């Protein structure tokens, strides 16, 4: 009988991860059958999707509230199928609110469970470790420090590296990226990434644009380039940019990035420095070895929600940006909340743009970080999943 694996991925990043894991599983266990919730990358590997990935996609608390009936229906159907015909192992990729609950019920029924991408308990709500311990047979984590954390808590864990480290080149090619984007080879370029969500753009774009205007005043030759994930976000950003004009500002979307490389990656690679919203983009910037200034602002309402959910006013770690968390140091500046003024952002970004010695030091630290994160992620993940399945057989 062929190996059967249940899987749930709820976001494009999870779909990409899962697609590569399925490829790794197929190389080691020909005939393996994977089914559950997934996206196009998983489907391309023969995944049987009971529900499309977007069935789990929500945008903020209001959207989540509106989607409760459909989310519960999807959850109930997936749980019923997996309990009726238990797989050899279940793999939840990220989406912790959905997957940890499902994993707990499956594990209680005797199905071993693997969770890929550890929730950020190291940043807030550490008490979730108890839910993870009850729900998960084996954790697969992306960052080296997470392995020690879960091992200390008695949870079987495997560090599999971060897949981005295997995709982004160890030695970025600034000239090639500029050629793709039509940017002069000798220009000074600032990449501006105010986030991919409407709320992030609304709160960060005005500050970033005012900072950029000051930087262009200091250096009229400076080129500011803003990658946008889709035309809708571009329209939202450009409406704000009309109120905060920056000479020579350029927005680019996927069609202008040329080739399969995400346009944001091309802009990072082409840049001298990056002004970036906290999130995965900070890790991508680090892997491109670029100096950066990290910023984030929450609305007053979201500040209250986050404080209530976490039961704390401050995070467990002094760092917010992933590069700083991984390096355990303020390697790059973080300007958050009330500190994220246009003047402060401009000053920190000017330093990132003009300090050549500092840029060389950052490049060396980010190169070492890249090497630490570089593993054969699909192979390591597939091997761990198969070992969990074999152990339960």
From Swiss-Prot:
GO terms for cellular component: membrane. InterPro entries: Glyco_trans_19 (IPR003835). Pathway: Bacterial outer membrane biogenesis; LPS lipid A biosynthesis. Pfam families: LpxB. It is an enzyme of class 2 (transferase). Its EC number is 2.4.1.182. Keywords: Glycosyltransferase, Lipid A biosynthesis, Lipid biosynthesis, Lipid metabolism, Transferase. It comes from Bordetella parapertussis (strain 12822 / ATCC BAA-587 / NCTC 13253). This is Lipid-A-disaccharide synthase. SUPFAM superfamilies: UDP-Glycosyltransferase/glycogen phosphorylase. It comes from the Bacteria. The gene is lpxB. Condensation of UDP-2,3-diacylglucosamine and 2,3-diacylglucosamine-1-phosphate to form lipid A disaccharide, a precursor of lipid A, a phosphorylated glycolipid that anchors the lipopolysaccharide to the outer membrane of the cell. GO terms for biological process: lipid A biosynthetic process. It catalyses: a lipid X + a UDP-2-N,3-O-bis[(3R)-3-hydroxyacyl]-alpha-D-glucosamine = a lipid A disaccharide + UDP + H(+).
């Amino acid at each position: 009988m062929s190996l059967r694996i249940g899987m749930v991925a709820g976001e494009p990043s999870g779909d990409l991860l899962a697609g590569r894991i399925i490829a790794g599983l197929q190389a080691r266990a020909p005939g393996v059958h994977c089914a559950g919730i997934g996206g196009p990358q998983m489907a391309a590997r023969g995944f049987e999707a009971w529900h499309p990935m977007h069935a789990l996609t929500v945008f903020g608390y209001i959207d989540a509230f509106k989607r409760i009936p459909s989310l519960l229906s999807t959850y109930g159907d997936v749980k019923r199928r997996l309990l009726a015909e238990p797989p050899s192992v279940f793999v939840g990729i990220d989406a912790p609110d959905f997957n940890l609950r499902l994993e707990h019920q499956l594990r209680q029924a005797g199905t071993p469970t693997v969770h890929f991408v550890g929730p950020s308990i190291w940043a807030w709500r550490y008490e979730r470790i108890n839910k993870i311990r009850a729900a998960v047979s084996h954790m697969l984590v992306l960052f080296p420090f997470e392995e020690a954390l879960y091992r200390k808590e008695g949870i079987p864990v495997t560090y599999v590296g971060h897949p981005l480290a295997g995709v982004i080149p160890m030695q970025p090619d600034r000239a090639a990226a500029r050629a793709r984007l039509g940017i002069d080879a000798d220009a000074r370029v600032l990449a501006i990434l105010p986030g991919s969500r409407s709320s992030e753009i609304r709160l960060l774009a005005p500050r970033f644009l005012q900072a950029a205007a000051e930087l262009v005043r200091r250096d009229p030759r400076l080129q500011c380039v803003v990658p946008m994930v889709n035309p809708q976000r571009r329209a939202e950003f450009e409406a704000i940019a009309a109120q905060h004009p920056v000479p020579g500002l350029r927005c680019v979307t996927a069609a202008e990035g040329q080739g399969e490389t995400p346009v944001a990656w091309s802009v990072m690679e082409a840049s001298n420095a990056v002004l970036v919203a906290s999130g995965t983009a900070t890790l991508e910037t680090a892997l491109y070895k670029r100096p950066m200034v990290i910023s984030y602002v929450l609305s007053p309402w979201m500040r209250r929600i986050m404080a209530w959910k976490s039961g704390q006013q401050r995070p467990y770690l002094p760092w917010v940006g992933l590069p700083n968390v991984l390096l355990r140091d303020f390697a790059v500046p973080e300007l958050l909340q009330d500190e994220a003024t246009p003047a402060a952002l401009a000053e920190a970004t000017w330093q990132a743009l003009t300090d050549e010695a500092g840029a060389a030091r950052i490049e060396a630290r980010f190169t070492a970080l890249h090497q630490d994160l570089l593993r054969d992620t699909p192979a390591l993940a597939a091997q761990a999943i198969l070992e969990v399945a074999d152990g339960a057989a």
